[in-house]
């Protein structure tokens, strides 16, 4: 295999805060064993060994949770030692960690900088929005702690971006959120529509995002971003940049814009491997790294079946004039009824593209020239 990317869950779903919308904690109920115990160094070393057994050009390691910093800094120092031990062919490596930032301190930041980690830091736009859903176990907001972490990352020149979960509480505050993040010195922003609990009816929670909510948010965010873009002052927003890339190259870099799922190689704390962190259930478990190498797991019949499920686009999608920009989006946002597949936010995205397409084309032409 030329390139391989792994998404490692060393602490399973355990976390030091209690976000109301946490989809990964919700997935515990889809596994007989629920939340796994924390990852051992033996399992971590085996993961690294397995990756370098099959990767010939590039290896990416992404750590997520739960909250992965709960493993402690020494765990990641051991990880770096293992990569040096097993990367005998000196292939390219990329390291990333997604965190709420609360445990970050000087030592963490020095380590992350020295080892070229990209940090994904969770923060929902403004303190007021963030502190509605991203709370501690005693119901206190976390924004002050996260902003302190942002300042630390900036002080030590650690590369990072902000992960912004868009909920109902944020739908009419896109411009306010953009300005706040920009004033914080944020350069990269990823927006992620909130997920309803697995198996629940859509819009069943106080934080749930309606179709109109997402439309308002995206259109407002695009307006302020576009005005900054034409003045070369924009915060880079992954979703908008992927739309432009799709127009230019016919394909984005986000898996949700590729038309079908791929195997993300999610590795849980006990060594179980899953195709995607939205599908970490017993039903979708591909096997365990103690029993199989990664090539066997990634090309297993279960993995092929998982990918095949996502190809089942409805005819409405293939007839849509925006199909090349959306391609049905991520199936986790879809409605499934007797194997029928349609993105819940289909009308939302159509209205968004109707509103923005002329400007998107202008940007794409500017990039192309």
Regions inferred by a protein language model and the residue ranges of each:
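Ferredoxin-like iron-sulfur electron-transfer modules
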Residues: 1-10, 304-312
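Canonical Radical SAM [4Fe-4S] cluster-binding loop centered on the CxxxCxxC motif
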Residues: 2-42
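Cysteine-centered iron-sulfur cluster-binding motifs in ferredoxin-type domains/subunits
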Residues: 11-18, 67-70, 261, 317-319, ...
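Radical SAM/AdoMet-radical enzyme domain recognition
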Residues: 44-62, 71-194, 203
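Radical SAM enzyme [4Fe-4S]-AdoMet core and its adjacent flexible, acidic
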Residues: 134-144, 151, 155-256, 260, ...
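Short, ordered coil/turn segments that flank beta-strands lining enzyme active or ligand-binding pockets
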Residues: 269
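Flexible mid-to-C-terminal extensions adjoining Fe-S/redox cofactors in radical SAM and related proteins
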Residues: 280-369
């Amino acid at each position: 295999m030329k390139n391989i990317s792994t998404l490692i869950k060393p602490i399973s779903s355990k976390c030091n805060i209690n976000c109301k919308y946490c989809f990964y904690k919700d997935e515990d109920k889809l596994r007989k064993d629920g939340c796994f115990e924390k990852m051992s160094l033996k399992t971590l070393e085996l993961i690294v060994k397995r990756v370098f057994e099959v990767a010939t050009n590039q290896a990416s390691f992404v750590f997520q949770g739960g909250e992965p910093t709960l493993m402690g800094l020494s765990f990641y120092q051991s990880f770096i030692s293992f990569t040096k031990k097993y990367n005998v062919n000196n292939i390219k490596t990329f390291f990333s960690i997604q965190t709420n930032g609360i445990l970050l301190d000087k030592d963490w930041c020095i380590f992350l900088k020295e080892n070229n980690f990209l940090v994904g830091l969770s923060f929902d736009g403004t303190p007021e929005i963030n502190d509605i859903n991203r709370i501690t176990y005693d119901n206190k907001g976390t924004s002050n702690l996260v902003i302190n972490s942002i300042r630390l990352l900036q002080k030590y020149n650690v590369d990072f971006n902000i992960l912004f979960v868009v909920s109902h509480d944020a739908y009419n505050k896109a411009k306010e959120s953009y300005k706040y993040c920009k004033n914080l010195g944020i350069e990269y922003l990823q927006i992620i529509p909130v997920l309803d609990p697995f198996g629940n009816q859509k819009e069943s929670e106080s934080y749930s995002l309606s179709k109109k909510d997402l439309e308002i948010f995206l259109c407002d965010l695009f307006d302020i971003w576009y005005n900054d873009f034409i003045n070369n002052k924009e915060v880079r927003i992954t979703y908008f940049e992927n739309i432009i890339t799709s127009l230019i190259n016919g394909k984005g870099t986000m898996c949700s814009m590729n038309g079908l799922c791929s195997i993300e190689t999610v590795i849980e704390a006990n060594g179980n491997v899953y195709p995607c962190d939205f599908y970490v259930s017993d039903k979708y478990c591909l096997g365990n790294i103690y029993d199989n190498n990664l090539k066997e797991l990634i090309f297993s019949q279960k993995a092929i079946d998982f990918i095949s499920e996502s190809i089942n686009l409805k005819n409405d999608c293939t007839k849509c004039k925006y199909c090349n920009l959306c391609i049905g989006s991520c199936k986790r946002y879809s409605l499934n009824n007797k194997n029928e597949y349609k993105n819940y936010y289909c009308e939302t995205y159509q209205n968004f593209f109707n509103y923005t397409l002329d400007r998107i084309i202008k940007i794409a032409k500017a990039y192309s020239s």
